[in-house]
A protein has these predicted regions:
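Membrane-interface aromatic/basic loop that binds lipid-linked glycans or pyrophosphate carriers
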Residues: 135-179
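Structural motif
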Residues: 119-126, 167
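Short intrinsically disordered, low-complexity coil segments enriched in acidic
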Residues: 1-11, 36, 163-168, 172, ...
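Hydrophobic alpha-helical core bundles mediating ligand binding, dimerization, or RNAP-core interactions
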Residues: 59-62, 104, 132
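Short amphipathic alpha-helical interaction patches enriched in hydrophobic/aromatic residues
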Residues: 45-49, 115, 139
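Amphipathic alpha-helical repeat scaffolds of TPR domains
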Residues: 125-138
Length: 179
């Protein structure tokens, strides 16, 4: 059963930055099985970006591959169908929330290292704030402590103090003292 179809790209080819902008802002939603790349690209770029549980690894990897190959193209035709085993993967499990938060922090650091020049753009900052809000509210369903929140805040603060304060202000009263 088809649940979601992404809107088409606005241009024939999008950069790694534009992919991240769309992904972080929630404009597109995709899974690893929707991306095709050559072994040569994989080898020449150093393979997959590694984060705990591979959480965020796919998005970082596709952005990296896109920057290496001058973009991602969308193939027209039938959408990809894939089986999402409800309650059988890490996305739906509270058991891995701590590792998801750690990986999210590493992903944010990766973005800071690879897209530093874009961090001044308000639309990129808005997308990053939206992304962190979705992680805290949906992916870990509010299952985070003040320590977790301040860890993300410290990482975001290095990217943009304003961005960090926006996230902190939205979640400080929702954080648990302990889990």
């Amino acid at each position: 059963k088809l649940k979601y179809i992404n809107p088409p790209f606005e241009t024939e080819r999008i950069s790694g930055y534009d992919f991240l902008l769309d992904k972080l802002s929630g404009k597109i939603s995709s899974a690893a099985c929707e991306y095709v790349f050559t072994r040569d690209v994989w080898k020449k770029t150093g393979g997959f970006v590694r984060f705990p549980l591979a959480w965020c690894s796919d998005d970082a990897t596709w952005a990296k591959f896109a920057d290496y190959t001058a973009g991602i193209i969308s193939l027209p035709g039938t959408p990809v169908y894939w089986r999402n085993a409800e309650n059988k993967n890490i996305s739906n499990s509270m058991r891995f929330d701590g590792e998801k938060l750690k990986a999210t922090g590493l992903f944010l650091k990766w973005i800071g290292m690879n897209y530093r020049l874009n961090l001044r753009e308000s639309r990129f900052q808005d997308a990053l704030v939206t992304y962190v809000n979705v992680i805290l509210e949906c992916s870990v369903r509010g299952n985070y402590t003040l320590k977790d929140l301040f860890s993300l805040y410290a990482i975001l603060r290095k990217l943009s103090p304003t961005m960090a304060l926006r996230v902190l202000r939205s979640h400080i009263l929702k954080a648990k003292l302990f889990i």
